[in-house]
Curated annotation (Swiss-Prot):
Disulfide bonds listed in the record: 13-118
Further comment: The variability of the residues taking part of IgE-binding epitopes might be responsible of the difference in cross-reactivity among olive pollen cultivars, and between distantly related pollen species, leading to a variable range of allergy reactions among atopic patients.
Protein name: Profilin-3
Subunit and interaction comment: Occurs in many kinds of cells as a complex with monomeric actin in a 1:1 ratio.
Keyword Disulfide bond on entry: yes
Residues with PTM Phosphothreonine: 114
Modification comment: Phosphorylated by MAP kinases.
SUPFAM superfamilies, alphabetized: Profilin (actin-binding protein)
UniProt motif Involved in PIP2 interaction: location: 84-100
GO MF annotation, one: actin monomer binding
Role: Binds to actin and affects the structure of the cytoskeleton. At high concentrations, profilin prevents the polymerization of actin, whereas it enhances it at low concentrations.
Main location: cytoplasm
Amino acid sequence: MSWQAYVDDHLMCDIEGHEGHRLTAAAIVGHDGSVWAQSATFPQFKPEEMNGIMTDFNEPGHLAPTGLHLGETKYMVIQGEAGAVIRGKKGSGGITIKKTGQALVFGIYEEPVTPGQCNMVVERLGDYLLEQGL
């Protein structure tokens, strides 16, 4: 399966039991910042933004004072899982980032999708990739 198929079929799909509810944007990005696959709506990001995200995975709390920046959007960092998941909130939407051995799985959402639904979609794919050694 191509990386784009993972984004299209496992991240940008309808959320179980909620037809028509789906993430706003999603991507799989290598630890080096190279985009493996992304939805058409995923924001163009700066290398320093990806560096900040990777630093927060290695040093949890790094982004808390400044917020998580991705493209033109600033998210307030909320409780995640140290070294494994970063979660951010902005208004009625937010972001979940799951770290795997080689990649970061991004999901961005707006209402009516809930934070928990975004977490489920992103973390399920991230856990699968971890199980595959990726």
